[in-house]
Amino acid sequence: MLRKNLYWLLLCLFLAGCGMIDYHPYDVHISGETNVNAHNIEKIEANCKGKTTIRFAVMGDSQRWYDATEDFVKEINKRDSIDFVIHGGDMSDFGVTKEFLWQRDIMNGLKVPYVALIGNHDCLGTGEETYKTVFGPTNFSFIAGNVKFVCLNTNALEYDYSEPIPNFTFMEEEITNRSDEFEKSVVCMHARPFTGVFNDNVAKVFQHYVTQYKGLQFCTAAHTHHFRDDILFDDGIHYITSDCMDYRTYLVFTIAPESTSENPDYELVEY
């Protein structure tokens, strides 16, 4: 009788515990939408086709600041002039799977499409694998109107320099890929040169490739958590860095037919 009662007690405890079983934080168990960037790039290219003027928002480093990111989404949704949003990376703090899913679900509340770059924190643990599943390749490009956006993984430090980051082969291919479809270009990254995470040994080579893009307007970055507008090399190209979400700001860029690299048209918006 005692053995029988013990059996039923253990069975009840086991069944009760089944509902409490959780996945390991780095298990890359993905629920919900995957390949987000590809889906949204289709929308961006379709929505902007034929446009000669485009306007887009840039932000980044939303890790930890979920409330501020939710408020950013609400802020953008109030505007009717934004074509799309670029998230400059660092959606996660520790590369935990759920961090990516929480951020994805918040950003999916935008009324306009968005793309997300990979940041250095997103590479921690199994973060890169999660990023690739949820968002897609770490290097990608798209065309909005007549402007090509080249989005790069520049987080060399997180790979211990064991992989070609930046990927110069990808950058070179994108110089001519779909070249008849764009007149201007923008290069986007999480960590710009000379920020510690970037492989500064190849900074000049990187800039050589950057300046080969047709009608280069400027470069965007995140990572430092502070707004900056820097000319890093002797070529006049602006590297414009967004604040982290904790500061509740974002950048809005406008690229029109008359736009040039000498004077990028943008505003720092507080919300």
List where the protein language model places each region.
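Binuclear metal-dependent phosphoesterase catalytic core
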Residues: 21-38, 42-43, 59, 142, ...
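Bacterial N-terminal signal peptides
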Residues: 5-17
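Active-site glycine-centered loops adjacent to acidic/histidine catalytic or metal-binding residues
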Residues: 61, 89-90, 119-120, 190, ...
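His/acidic metal-ligating clusters that form di-metal
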Residues: 77-84, 159-238, 267-269
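Stable alpha-helical elements in mature extracytoplasmic
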Residues: 52, 65-72, 88, 99, ...
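N-terminal active-site segment of His-dependent metallophosphoesterases
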Residues: 18-102, 182
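Core catalytic region of metal-dependent phosphoesterases/phosphodiesterases
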Residues: 69-139, 143-144
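Active-site-proximal beta-strand elements of phosphoester/diester hydrolases
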Residues: 53-63, 146-156, 186-188, 238-244
